[in-house]
């Protein structure tokens, strides 16, 4: 695998679960500056372990966001933070090819799970969830594609501009960011991923249970998927 840095977990649960009113206040005051900058680490050149597929496929507290057929021979689970630049890179480069070549042809089932590293990532994940099933992945794609526009010191206005394209009004935007149940569900899944599957950086992928930390190129993904498609 090509060596690339990845965003590492540097924040504690008490900072992630900051409360719904406080979340909006933090974003209004400057959502990025509130956090320590993430450390960087080299991506690994191969699988770094393996987890139980039975455990991995237990849905997240809010339910999983899935693309592809349930009987696909390969299941890929990605844990990503919406503010992670290497997650954005994967979704702008490898993901479109993966979806066209493997997901849309019934070879891969793709499960995307949120692993927010900061309040801004948490807010973007909440907005994608609030958008609904049909608009979830398009809004995820939009946030990744325009990451440089909204991962800024004053993020609320550019975030709303993106969310507005998915049908949000100012009222529904504010209501979403004040949804404590959704916030708690995302935080609970982040905690489960960390404790159960040793996810401590983003992006982290599980390909049929094998763990890969760091972004994957299309060629690297082809290499890892190929053995499961033989015969």
Task: Identify the role of each PLM range.
Residues 76, 84, 173:
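Residue-level signature of catalytic and energy-coupling elements of molecular machines
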Residues 70, 103-105, 198-200:
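Extracellular/periplasmic catalytic domains that process cell-envelope and extracellular macromolecules
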Residues 2-46, 164-231:
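C-terminal cap of thioredoxin/glutaredoxin-like
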Residues 78-81, 199:
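Processing junctions and N-termini across compartments
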Residues 80-83, 88-164:
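Structural alpha/beta surface segment adjacent to cysteine/selenocysteine redox centers
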Residues 46-58:
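N-terminal low-complexity, Pro/Thr/Ser-rich intrinsically disordered segments
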Residues 57-74:
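A short beta-strand-turn-helix
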